[in-house]
Amino acid sequence: MSDQNNTPAASQDENHIISERREKLAAWRAGGRAFPNDFSRENIAGKLDEIYGEKESQELDATPVEVKVAGRIMLKRVMGKASFMTIQDLSGQIQLYVTRDAVGEDVYADFKHWDIGDIVGAVGTLFKTRTGELSVKCTDIRLLTKSLRPLPDKFHGLTDVEQKYRQRHLDLIMNEQTRFTFVARSRMVQSIRNYMVSHGFLEVETPMMHPIPGGAAAKPFTTHHNALDMELFLRIAPELYLKRLVVGGFEKVFEVNRNFRNEGLSPRHNPEFTMMEFYEAYANYKSLMNFTEGLLRQAAREALGTEVFVYQGRELDLSKPFARLTIVEAIHQFHPGFSIAQLNDEAWLRAKLTDLKAKLRDDAGLGTLQLMLFEETTEAELWEPTFIIDYPAEVSPLARRNDANPEITERFELFIVGREIANGFSELNDPEDQAARFLEQVKAKEAGDEEAMFYDADYIRALEYGLPPTGGCGIGIDRLVMLLTDSPSIRDVILFPQMRTE
């Protein structure tokens, strides 16, 4: 038995392998049949295994099942007049049994020169090997695509993290977990869309290039429109456009799309990321929290089949009601040594934050100081799903003030495994209050805050036509996928994450 092509790239020099494969391609071209596109696949590996994997060998022999499969060669064993190969498609792998007598001498002679990574199409009948493996006994097999570059060694796989991100196509070929992650992502996003539509929401698309960046506190990317000779900004959030639609009478809208923020890279941050934002007239932040819980449970069921799963070695249960705590309540719960009186004392908060080496602004008020202490000491502790509610007005320029206490807003952020997953609030629909808060943001920007918002006069004009009482929420799709696929880094769940140029 020969080990010819038994593993993807062995110890040979890669350039030599590529040269040999180019020679094979040249010979294939000379035959006038290179890269055909007339093979029609009728079966996929995973479905065949699902239907026939448990059937007995005698049953398959008694009632032959003809199949047409196609995929990439991942393993090949040539044994004289009979050979085995394993091919892979998105659904899984299946073994092919190829003999000279069944496919003919010419085809078998060509077959022996095919390489790991080549893509083939095969016709045959299902059978079970002596070890019980479901296989295809080929009556015809064709080379469909020649692979010129060798795949990584199957025993070591693609282990270089940078290479995985830069060559995602190779990562998808070699790593089943990567394929699972992105299939799960697709299913999750589709389930979110279905959930929104089933609750009466209309999916819309809003501009990706804005004359004024708005809807979030973030530094934007800039670009220039040549024909209009104007500076534009890649959107940091779709919020202000979506709320314009609510003004226009679209009472329940949502959008799944990209945002761009010219900020740092981290396991939780990528400058280009996906958000789902939704807005509902005659709703408030309390009803939105209930809705968001239901949406996340549905996403988990669709992606994983369960609401209880393990993330990074710890169990997480989305089936239980999510906790709801104010900023001060959360700090005190996880750090009972900090008294409620201390947490409401500006001088104590400043001293504590100084000890923690936090960057303090002179104009930071009580609410900002409490939020900073929460972020420094408590945010990472919120493993179980927890809504942090009633954010200070000074850090929530688009949120409605609380009627009982105008220093806070009707706003929440949802944290799971110590990460912000969602941010929502009762929308500020008072145009005069919104204008005043925009002016405060302008002052902050002039004082050096690059993430402070611009004054958006056109949005104020839209509010002056009347925005009904409205609730809105944004959910980070990438972070949610991280959660549901047990992925430690946001780069693991973005097909082509931003990378530094090689």
UniProtKB/Swiss-Prot annotation:
Superkingdom: Bacteria
Compartment(s): Cytoplasm
Keyword terms: Aminoacyl-tRNA synthetase, ATP-binding, Cytoplasm, Ligase, Magnesium, Metal-binding, Nucleotide-binding, Protein biosynthesis
Gene Ontology process terms (BP): lysyl-tRNA aminoacylation
Cofactor note: Binds 3 Mg(2+) ions per subunit.
Residues the entry annotates as binding Mg(2+) 2: E420
GO molecular function ontology, one term from the record: magnesium ion binding
E.C. no: 6.1.1.6
Binding site for Mg(2+) 1: E413, E420
Catalysed reactions, semicolon-separated: tRNA(Lys) + L-lysine + ATP = L-lysyl-tRNA(Lys) + AMP + diphosphate
Cofactor(s) for this UniProt protein: Mg(2+)
A single cellular component GO annotation: cytosol
Family the UniProt entry places it in: Belongs to the class-II aminoacyl-tRNA synthetase family.
Subunit field text: Homodimer.
Protein name in the entry: Lysine--tRNA ligase
Organism: Aromatoleum aromaticum (strain DSM 19018 / LMG 30748 / EbN1) (Azoarcus sp. (strain EbN1))
Lineage start: Bacteria, Pseudomonadati, Pseudomonadota, Betaproteobacteria, Rhodocyclales
